[in-house]
Amino acid sequence: MKNINPTQTSAWQALQKHYDEMKDVTIAELFANDSDRFAKFSATFDDLMLVDFSKNRITEETLAKLQDLAKLQDLAGAIKSMFSGEKINRTEDRAVLHVALRNRSNTPIIVDGKDVMPEVNAVLEKMKTFSQAIISGQWKGYTGKAITDVVNIGIGGSDLGPFMVTEALRPYKNHLTMHFVSNVDGTHIAEVLKKVNPETTLFLVASKTFTTQETMTNAHSARDWFLKTAGDEKHVAKHFAALSTNAKAVGEFGIDTANMFEFWDWVGGRYSLWSAIGLSIILSVGFDNFVELLSGAHAMDKHFSTTPAEKNLPILLALIGIWYNNFFGAETEAILPYDQYMHRFAAYFQQGNMESNGKYVDRNGNAVDYQTGPIIWGEPGTNGQHAFYQLIHQGTKMVPCDFIAPAITHNPLSDHHQKLLSNFFAQTEALAFGKSREVVEQEYRDQGKDPAQLEHVVPFKVFEGNRPTNSILLREITPFSLGALIALYEHKIFTQGAILNIFTFDQWGVELGKQLANRILPELGDDKAISSHDSSTNGLINRYKAWRA
């Protein structure tokens, strides 16, 4: 990968000049000037997904200049480096190969001279055998009863991904009830344990090192709770499995290492749902549906790695994002799924994007003088319409939005889905084209209102429009299409990081807080006043101690 400051390229300078020409052009004008705009600025993927990016403040010239930037930053070389197993995560000296986990073609992928695919397939086969035993009821708990509940204990990538996918694929779930515990706040594990029976519960402890503070604290609390009923520690092996690489610690915990499912250093946490971390997904929807999820992601991987940049969906979305973030000064992007099953999708890619590209140092170790990752947020429609859409429509901040919806619902109740989709279509139209003062005034006249009253109301009912959106319309949310959609966003994030000359696959920003927490923890064990920190931290700790006493 080339380590080039993008702002020093001729393409960036050309984009800056182009922005000066485009900043006052409206989306309405762009549509008025081109009757074929939708056809030119939309694309389909496998007849399963339509991506419409026509309601953006872009022209063909904009995209051409953004493509020039991608070429000068050697995006094609970066893609090749990732897929070939090069150690592009240089700060940790690791390859980045979540694509290998879903490599359904089984073509060799080499890391350190070794094809990783046999090991990937071996773990998949092991998960298949284990999950079939649990789902079928063949696996028995310590009293001879079949498993009814599964509790996944993890945090970050070991929680967000599996939780998001099991919720998104809830129409495909079997009889097992899934629970997810992540927060070290004891309330989280306590509330879950109230719902389950130790005789019929399986705990999955998801920690690569088996030392993650939050996960192991919750795991030990779950173990203590279990043993209060089960008594004998040998029963732990029937009710706990591990997603880890630390066989010694797993065995010491009481888990049979035959029920330890491994993954590798080249699997980043926020890209790990495709690995053994996805065991909870398999237990929820079955192995065949998990393979479909992998297959959908693999199909998007092939699209990303082989399709020319001009028609490459992850690249196009990434470039449009850079355009807004760096030239228009947009600081956030909203992800708005119009599907209740997808209610954790925005939260998942909040981590996926912000932990990946929330960096202020470039690949040369220098502080950047441009914008890197945006703030990602969002909620399902139509809930968001009655919450924060006001600011998107009439606020002073530009918030580019991704609207996501399935054409076919899993729950065709009455006319619910038509009403949902009517809002989906209406919102992007309203954001793009707005409502002029003239239209508002005419509406008041048509209603017979007193013209003298117009000035008191009209300004507040005007919508400027010109708010950019992408619309992603899926035929239906299935394991395959969900896999493709997740991979689309993953590759968008990678593309932006490659072009912006940052390391996307490390996350050193999470370390300092953990280090300080480990120093503070012993200080909370007594009632002595603390004076070893700044006055604010001392004051907070001392008030905590006073109140808990």
Swiss-Prot record:
Secretion signal, residue range per the UniProt entry: none
Pathway of action: Carbohydrate biosynthesis; gluconeogenesis; Carbohydrate degradation; glycolysis; D-glyceraldehyde 3-phosphate and glycerone phosphate from D-glucose: step 2/4
Listed EC numbers: 5.3.1.9
GO biological process, one term: glucose 6-phosphate metabolic process
Pfam family, one: PGI
Matching Gene3D superfamilies: 1.10.1390.10, Glucose-6-phosphate isomerase like protein, domain 1
Main location, first listed in the record: cytoplasm
Gene Ontology CC terms: cytosol
Key words, A-Z: Cytoplasm, Gluconeogenesis, Glycolysis, Isomerase
Catalytic activity: alpha-D-glucose 6-phosphate = beta-D-fructose 6-phosphate
Catalytic machinery residues: 355 (proton donor), 386, 514
Entry's localization field: Cytoplasm
Domain of life: Bacteria
Recorded GO MF terms: carbohydrate derivative binding; glucose-6-phosphate isomerase activity; monosaccharide binding
Cysteine pairs bridged by disulfides in the record: none
Similarity-based family: Belongs to the GPI family.
Function comment: Catalyzes the reversible isomerization of glucose-6-phosphate to fructose-6-phosphate.
Protein name in UniProt: Glucose-6-phosphate isomerase
Organism of provenance: Salmonella gallinarum (strain 287/91 / NCTC 13346)
